């Protein structure tokens, strides 16, 4: 591989200070410190199952709640991914994954289309996972989608345990990312679109 697909993005606002460094062609190494333990756990799933190296440091207004931190980590990760993947030449573009965890099953499908769109259908069985508000899962993915410029479909097909539901979503997301971002040796240097650009 001639050019490393890496990026580092810093985002500072009155609400959060975030730094994200990624290597799309990594091995799943991670260093995560967002101040939101459950978010760190979910980001670890993305790294491990996507084989993406992630280094994320975040400080936010957690004295209010975790909303700004979770959303802004999604935004910054999306920006980093867009920068690292570059012009998208040679990538597979589309990725999908089904992931089970005991009784839970989720499907994630992604398209590096250049157009942001999120379909999020996760009927969580409770509103909190420990101290984590499950509504923030949607905010994370909306932030990612808007800044990575991808079309993302997330469906939890079944599940009784909210932790399992959420974990299958993040694992499937990591695996779908890996598939879509993978370089196809049969289309080196080619944009995977009849338009010639994405």
UniProtKB/Swiss-Prot annotation:
Catalyzed reactions per annotation: D-erythro-1-(imidazol-4-yl)glycerol 3-phosphate = 3-(imidazol-4-yl)-2-oxopropyl phosphate + H2O
Gene Ontology MF, one: imidazoleglycerol-phosphate dehydratase activity
Pfam family, one: IGPD
Gene Ontology CC annotations of this record: cytoplasm
Signal sequence segment: none
Known pathway: Amino-acid biosynthesis; L-histidine biosynthesis; L-histidine from 5-phospho-alpha-D-ribose 1-diphosphate: step 6/9
Enzyme class: lyase
Enzyme Commission number, as recorded: 4.2.1.19
Recorded family membership: Belongs to the imidazoleglycerol-phosphate dehydratase family.
Protein name: Imidazoleglycerol-phosphate dehydratase
Gene label: hisB
């Amino acid at each position: 591989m001639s050019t490393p697909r890496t990026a580092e993005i810093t985002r500072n606002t009155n609400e959060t200070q975030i730094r994200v460094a990624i290597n799309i062609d990594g091995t799943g190494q991670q260093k995560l410190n967002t101040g939101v333990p459950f978010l760190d756990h979910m980001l670890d799933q993305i790294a491990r199952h996507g084989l993406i190296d992630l280094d994320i440091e975040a400080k936010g207004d957690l004295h209010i709640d975790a909303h700004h931190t979770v959303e802004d980590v999604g935004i910054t990760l999306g920006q980093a991914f867009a920068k690292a993947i570059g012009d998208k030449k040679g990538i597979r573009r589309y990725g999908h994954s089904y992931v089970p965890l005991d009784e839970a099953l989720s499907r994630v499908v992604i398209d590096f289309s250049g157009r942001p769109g999120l379909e999020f259908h996760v009927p969580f069985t409770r509103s909190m996972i420990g101290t984590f508000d499950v509504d923030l899962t949607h905010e994370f993915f909306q932030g990612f989608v808007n800044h990575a410029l991808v079309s993302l479909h997330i469906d939890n097909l079944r599940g009784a345990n909210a932790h399992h539901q959420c974990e299958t979503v993040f694992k499937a997301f990591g695996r779908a990312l890996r598939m879509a971002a993978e370089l196809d040796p049969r289309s080196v240097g080619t944009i995977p679109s009849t338009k010639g650009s994405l």
